[in-house]
Amino acid sequence: MNINKGALIFVDLDGLKIINDTYGHEGGDEAIITGAKILKDAFDEFGVIGRIGGDEFAVFLPNQSDFALSEINQLINDKTIYHNTLIKRNFKVELSYGISLFDQYQDLTVRELLDKADREID
């Protein structure tokens, strides 16, 4: 695969500690699974999704550019709304995320791209 540019998304599951404290680890597990399903539904066809640990995920989108940012935002928002209405639960799953774009001219490691995306979280 020839990758000239792309995007790396750093995703944080909002309020996991509160969900764990209020609904127990079962609720926390359900929130993590739902967060993963949101990302899978949004990006599985053209990206690579991984759980970094705890409440953090990363999504690698090869060959994406800044023109795709609004599409990325829309996908995450649409899938979050869908999964929050699909199953009625006592809490909503919300994601915060930052996007780091790169191209073949940048000399950045994956860690540097993740750190850059983490700083972009809204």
Can you say where each PLM-predicted feature lies in the sequence?
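Residues immediately flanking
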Residues: 11-13, 63, 97
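Short loop/turn elements that form and flank the Walker-type P-loop nucleotide-binding site
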Residues: 3-4, 92-94
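Short catalytic/binding micro-motifs of nucleotide second-messenger systems
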Residues: 41-46, 77-90
